[in-house]
From Swiss-Prot:
Species this protein is from: Rhodopseudomonas palustris (strain TIE-1)
Region listing for Disordered, in residue ranges: 1-26
Source lineage: Bacteria, Pseudomonadati, Pseudomonadota, Alphaproteobacteria, Hyphomicrobiales
UniProt keyword list: ATP synthesis, Cell inner membrane, Cell membrane, CF(0), Hydrogen ion transport, Ion transport, Membrane, Transmembrane, Transmembrane helix, Transport
A GO CC term assigned to this protein in UniProt: plasma membrane
Record localization: Cell inner membrane
Family note: Belongs to the ATPase B chain family.
Topology class, membrane: Single-pass membrane protein
Name assigned to this protein: ATP synthase subunit b 2
């Protein structure tokens, strides 16, 4: 059935090496050293060619493309900054122009309102002067009429007083001249 591990037929144990020492590590064997250097040189040349002809141009292309993109972005940013600066200058110029126009409109409006107010003031002064002149005429007329009535009343009162005090009826011309003299003076 099952056989043991130790007694396999046709196998021999290789536990000992002939000659008494071990073989050196193959890369350090002096007989193969020259061929190893040639193989190393060929491998480095092949690696150098692969890197310089395939990998480095790709990396260089990527770096160059990135630099172009960065330069393009910087140029676009400078252009946009210039446009923004121009727009800001135009805005400030428009704002200054609008302020100047607003001040001019304000000054013009003030002048118009002042002229209109002055014209209305003069018209009002003329109307008030005319009303004052009419009122003075009315007062003078009323005063003259009142003084005429006062003169008549004073003459009648003086005649009545003289008549009551003296018992004599005075002359109307003498009473009128006495009343006129007292009113004048």
């Amino acid at each position: 059935m099952a056989q043991g591990h130790g007694d396999a037929k046709g196998t021999t144990a290789h536990t000992e090496a002939g000659g008494g020492h071990k073989a050196p590590f193959p890369p350090f064997q002096q007989e193969t050293f020259a061929s190893q250097l040639v193989s190393l040189a060929i491998a480095f040349v092949a690696l150098y060619l692969i890197v310089s002809k395939i990998a480095l141009p790709r990396v260089g292309g990527v770096i160059e493309e990135r630099q172009k993109t960065i330069d393009g972005d910087l140029a676009a940013a400078q252009k946009l900054k210039g446009e923004a600066d121009d727009a800001l200058k135009a805005y400030e110029a428009e704002l200054a122009d609008a302020r100047a126009r607003a001040q001019a409109i304000g000054a013009e409006t003030r002048e118009k309102l002042n002229a209109q107010a002055e014209a209305e003031r003069k018209t009002l002064e003329q109307r008030l002067a005319a009303k004052l002149a009419d009122a003075e005429k009315t007062i003078a007329t009323t005063r003259t009429a009142a003084m005429g009535n006062v003169r008549n009343i004073a003459s009648d009162a003086a005649s009545a007083i003289v008549q009551q005090l003296a018992g004599v009826t005075p002359d109307s011309k003498a009473v009128d001249s006495a009343v006129d003299a007292s009113l004048k003076g």
